[in-house]
Regions:
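Class I S-adenosyl-L-methionine-dependent methyltransferase catalytic core
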Residues: 1-149
Length: 149
């Protein structure tokens, strides 16, 4: 429900997209456009097939890149997102650097949200310019919702 409120006509950045579950669901619920970032070849192919099967090619773009390597050249100069979803592998420990990079690149809209999917119990450190506004636990997962400050 928290996410539904923000989806209407939103632009979404889905980092570590996998087969696209989050981003595809966003489109189905009213997002205007989703950028999918994934770089594992077998999963990337499934993601492209899923987008094609749902006929979402005009509402999405797939970028074959490691999300930790995004920079200002990855997107258009004025590109901003209302929602940025980060679903890195559970073993990944560079979350602080990723969030710091997102904030420094200034690709999050003023009132946009960053959602981070983590293993329940992980104690991540976040940059000073990121404020956690909510957390939700589901099974073995935790979703951290935050904003830049």
């Amino acid at each position: 429900n928290f996410i539904n409120f923000h989806l209407k006509d939103s632009k979404v950045l889905d980092l570590f997209s996998g087969i696209g579950s989050f981003g595809l669901e966003c489109i189905s619920r009213g997002s205007k456009f989703v950028f999918f970032l994934e770089n594992y070849p077998p999963v990337l192919e499934i993601l492209k097939i899923n987008i094609s099967n749902l006929k979402y090619e005009t509402k999405s773009k797939v970028i074959d890149i490691d999300a930790f390597k995004i920079n200002n050249n990855t997107f258009k100069d004025d590109q901003k997102f209302q929602i940025i979803f980060c679903d890195p592998p559970y073993k990944e420990k560079k979350i602080e650097l990723l969030i710091k990079n997102i904030i420094e690149m200034n690709i999050l809209e003023e009132n946009g949200i960053i959602i981070i999917h983590r293993k329940k119990g992980d104690l991540d450190i976040y940059p000073k310019k990121f404020k956690v506004i909510d957390t939700k636990n589901y099974g073995l997962s935790t979703f951290v919702f935050g904003r830049k400050i």
